[in-house]
Amino acid sequence: MSDFDSNPFADPDLNNPFKDPSVTQVTRNVPPGLDEYNPFSDSRTPPPGSVKMPNVPNTQPAIMKPTEEHPAYTQITKEHALAQAELLKRQEELERKAAELDRREREMQNLSQHGRKNNWPPLPSNFPVGPCFYQDFSVDIPVEFQKTVKLMYYLWMFHAVTLFLNIFGCLAWFCVDSSRAVDFGLSILWFLLFTPCSFVCWYRPLYGAFRSDSSFRFFVFFFVYICQFAVHVLQAAGFHNWGNCGWISSLTGLNKNIPVGIMMIIIAALFTASAVISLVMFKKVHGLYRTTGASFEKAQQEFATGVMSNKTVQTAAANAASTAATSAAQNAFKGNQM
């Protein structure tokens, strides 16, 4: 209080600490923006750095986006579904086979009660000769093999028709060339020979092989069918004096007469188709044979069992044994007398 000056005429800034030159020099160096900024004034805009954006609420729904890697439980579910589908498929197949076996068993029982009559070839009732074989694909052949056996049956029929047309082709060739009498005669012989022999020698063994799953009959079919395929190739070739309207004979006949040559070319094409289809079906039957579990060892066992169980063979063996024993006894008795 001692420093307080009551003189009204004295300089008011004399004792003012804020008027010190060192203080006023520092205050003059403040940036001009701070002097002009008034925090309580609304007329002036705040500096750009101090402006804050309002918080906008997120309007998107809270959905979890799937990642690239699927969870482990998804893969397990898929594997379980595939395994279940496979089991259902196998179950349906087993049920179908069981139903087929039941149906075949009932039909076999009906046939055993009423007798199994031959129905092939389908001849009229008043014909002097009756059917020789029994054939029913739905009864004898399993479902998975019926289509193949039917195709082989149709192939046999196709070859028989081709042999029948071959007779007319050789006849037409003989009409324009009198030196082809041998071909015409052989064409008749081939039709009468190959039609029944092919049915008995390779088709019936195939039918019986699929009917009873016989390995021995499969091997009989393969052996005979290879020979049959060789016959198809020779017939398609058509060598002279062999009784076939093959390609060689067709070209020769075409030089003699164009209509006859065209007819022979058609027959040669049928023989060629028989050879090609025979090769395709041979591969198909061989593939099915590999899936049936047949083998050469089983064929040997079936052959031995069939031979030993055959009554004719048993009778012949017994007669041979008795004859040998009788002759041995007689020789021994004569030796003792001497």
From Swiss-Prot:
Which residues are annotated with the PTM N-acetylserine? 2
| Gene Ontology CC terms | clathrin-coated vesicle; cytoplasmic vesicle membrane; membrane; recycling endosome membrane; synapse; synaptic vesicle; synaptic vesicle membrane; trans-Golgi network
Q: Which GO terms describe its biological process?
A: endocytosis; establishment of localization in cell; exocytosis; protein transport
Any transmembrane segments, and where? 156-176, 182-202, 219-239, 262-282
Q: Which residues belong to the signal peptide in this entry?
A: none
Phosphoserine modified-residue sites: 2
**Bilayer topology:** Multi-pass membrane protein
Q: Which InterPro entries match?
A: SCAMP
Keyword annotations: Acetylation, Endosome, Golgi apparatus, Membrane, Phosphoprotein, Protein transport, Transmembrane, Transmembrane helix, Transport
Q: Which family does it belong to?
A: Belongs to the SCAMP family.
Q: What is the recorded name of this protein?
A: Secretory carrier-associated membrane protein 1
Question: Which species is this UniProt entry from?
Answer: Mus musculus
Instruction: Provide the organism lineage as a comma list.
Output: Eukaryota, Metazoa, Chordata, Craniata, Vertebrata
